Amino acid sequence: DLVALSGAHTIGQAR
């Protein structure tokens, strides 16, 4: 579940 967490984190961080 690292990919899912990383993806969400990346989007939130980028936003």
Swiss-Prot record:
PROSITE patterns: PEROXIDASE_1. The lineage of its organism: Eukaryota, Viridiplantae, Streptophyta, Embryophyta, Tracheophyta. This is Peroxidase 2. Belongs to the peroxidase family. Classical plant (class III) peroxidase subfamily. Its cofactor is Ca(2+); heme b. Heme binds at residue 9. Removal of H(2)O(2), oxidation of toxic reductants, biosynthesis and degradation of lignin, suberization, auxin catabolism, response to environmental stresses such as wounding, pathogen attack and oxidative stress. These functions might be dependent on each isozyme/isoform in each plant tissue. It is found in: Secreted; Secreted, Cell wall. Ca(2+) binds at residue 10.
